[in-house]
């Protein structure tokens, strides 16, 4: 088996710094996007509720038309 390679402390520092910066960026981006996604879900739920109500009314009208004929 090949022995582990010695890595420069400067390279290790750079790698861990990039990791920490990426985690910080991800946390900041997530906190920015989360409220927007919640708003989109809320609007979509309201739209779905409105469409379901329209479909229900349309279905009731269609059933009412068949009874009268």
From Swiss-Prot:
Pfam families: ATP-synt_E. Disulfide bonds: none annotated. One of its GO terms (molecular function) is proton transmembrane transporter activity. Its main location: mitochondrion. Keywords: Acetylation, ATP synthesis, CF(0), Hydrogen ion transport, Ion transport, Membrane, Mitochondrion, Mitochondrion inner membrane, Transport. Signal peptide: none annotated. Induction: By UV light. GO terms for cellular component: mitochondrial inner membrane; proton-transporting ATP synthase complex. GO terms for biological process: proton motive force-driven ATP synthesis. It is found in: Mitochondrion; Mitochondrion inner membrane. The modification N6-acetyllysine is found at residue 34. It comes from the Eukaryota. Coiled coil: none annotated. Component of the ATP synthase complex composed at least of ATP5F1A/subunit alpha, ATP5F1B/subunit beta, ATP5MC1/subunit c (homooctomer), MT-ATP6/subunit a, MT-ATP8/subunit 8, ATP5ME/subunit e, ATP5MF/subunit f, ATP5MG/subunit g, ATP5MK/subunit k, ATP5MJ/subunit j, ATP5F1C/subunit gamma, ATP5F1D/subunit delta, ATP5F1E/subunit epsilon, ATP5PF/subunit F6, ATP5PB/subunit b, ATP5PD/subunit d, ATP5PO/subunit OSCP. Subunit e, of the mitochondrial membrane ATP synthase complex (F(1)F(0) ATP synthase or Complex V) that produces ATP from ADP in the presence of a proton gradient across the membrane which is generated by electron transport complexes of the respiratory chain. ATP synthase complex consist of a soluble F(1) head domain - the catalytic core - and a membrane F(1) domain - the membrane proton channel. These two domains are linked by a central stalk rotating inside the F(1) region and a stationary peripheral stalk. Belongs to the ATPase e subunit family. PANTHER family: ATP SYNTHASE E CHAIN, MITOCHONDRIAL (PTHR12427), ATP SYNTHASE SUBUNIT E, MITOCHONDRIAL (PTHR12427:SF1). This is ATP synthase F(0) complex subunit e, mitochondrial.
